[in-house]
Amino acid sequence: MSRAAPFTVLIPARLASTRLPNKPLADIAGLPMVVHVARRASQSGAQRCVVAADDARIVQACQAHGVQALLTRADHASGSDRLAEACELLGLAGEDIVVNVQGDEPLIDPRLIDAVAALLHARGDASMGTAAHAIDSAEDFANPNVVKVVLDAQGLAHYFSRAPIPHARDHGPGSLWWQPGQTGVPVGFAPLRHIGIYSYRAGFLRRFPQLPAAPTEQLEALEQLRALWHGHRIAVHVTGSAPGAGVDTPADLERVRTLLGG
């Protein structure tokens, strides 16, 4: 696909992590992980890639490798709050497009970043954009750690859930009603796994943390449900391939080190 129209990549990076302390600074092939993320993101069509950090050590590590970084407050409740502050610090206009790339995604595909940014340039009615891909196993469909998304006819998110959605009434009870090759389902149906990358209009991103939390958001522990609850539209890019693995645990880190030669 062609390059997206202008946008900024923001990479939230938080030093505290219960499962992997100092995660943004974890060494991978001689570079901090967050620098790998920024370098991958810079291969997209973004005008600039900026790390929004909660600790001066992250800022220093980024600057040592030529990566732009901002020091944000350490007490933000979520990554969205951190990004909202970054928008203010950068002086982004309300209609400017921002793509949130997680700081633990050193294998992020730059083409996916472009695609998610392009959603908002193409869809003036959407406040957010994100991505999904087809689930290919019954285990993933049933796994609550695999977030599912159902789309409407316009490619907008209808709902996100940790539950296996949609549920097929006529296939009986249980979470494993679907499996690859399942018969008796509508033509073209495939359950979709949500990919945790987002694009926003900067004005909406600044307002988002002030929106009251949604009951569905609190039940599912999925922040994007707040946007749907308050009537905002989320456009979804369906990609044909699964994203590169993120880094949440020491085992994940070792796997990525092997892939990147570290």
UniProtKB/Swiss-Prot annotation:
The main location class comes to cytoplasm
Query: Gene3D superfamilies from the xrefs?
Result: Spore Coat Polysaccharide Biosynthesis Protein SpsA, Chain A
Pathway(s) it belongs to: Nucleotide-sugar biosynthesis; CMP-3-deoxy-D-manno-octulosonate biosynthesis; CMP-3-deoxy-D-manno-octulosonate from 3-deoxy-D-manno-octulosonate and CTP: step 1/1; Bacterial outer membrane biogenesis; lipopolysaccharide biosynthesis
User: In terms of domain of life, where is this protein from?
Assistant: Bacteria
InterPro entries associated with the record: Cytidylyl_trans (IPR003329), KdsB (IPR004528), Nucleotide-diphossugar_trans (IPR029044)
Membrane spanning stretches: none
If you read the UniProt record, what top EC class would you report for this enzyme, in one word?
transferase
Can you say where in the cell this protein is located? Answer: Cytoplasm
Pfam entry (one): CTP_transf_3
Return the protein name: 3-deoxy-manno-octulosonate cytidylyltransferase
Source organism per entry reads Acidovorax ebreus (strain TPSY)
